[in-house]
Amino acid sequence: MNTEPGDLRPPAAATAPTHCTAPTPIVYSCSGCSSAAQLASPVALRLDRCGAAEMSCIAGVGGDVPHLMKTARSGRPIIALDGCPLVCVKSTLARHGIEPARHYQLQQYGVKKRAHEDFDPAQAALVLERVLDDLHYEPLTGAPTAAQPRRETAHG
């Protein structure tokens, strides 16, 4: 575990899925203008970089971009990170009939929504640690649908 305040580096590879046939989850994050929204993005990026999930673009889902819609509908488990109670990520997915396997509303971790302020990197590191712990203790399940048997890349 990282002990430096604000250190967003994930723990070593022990957090990556352990079952080789389990599909890598897709993670979508809020990217609004508040401090809470901006905190969600680096958490999603760290999940991507450590291999716990593959980040994709929620704006592309909202914009009906075909390639990104194909990824969202691939049948892989989805992690939604919403910065505030407006739950824009969850709502954008729901507009397309997509339910995340795991939804994290960052206010549940004490993240406050503040306009015109930067997020606290130490708080982002704590949120990352809690999300990784949750994913470790309650792994996501899911498999690609029959129509989409091969793994799609989530990068947008």
Task: Give the location of each predicted region.
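Iron-sulfur (Fe-S) cluster-binding modules
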Residues: 1-57, 67, 72-77, 87-156
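A general structural motif
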Residues: 58-62
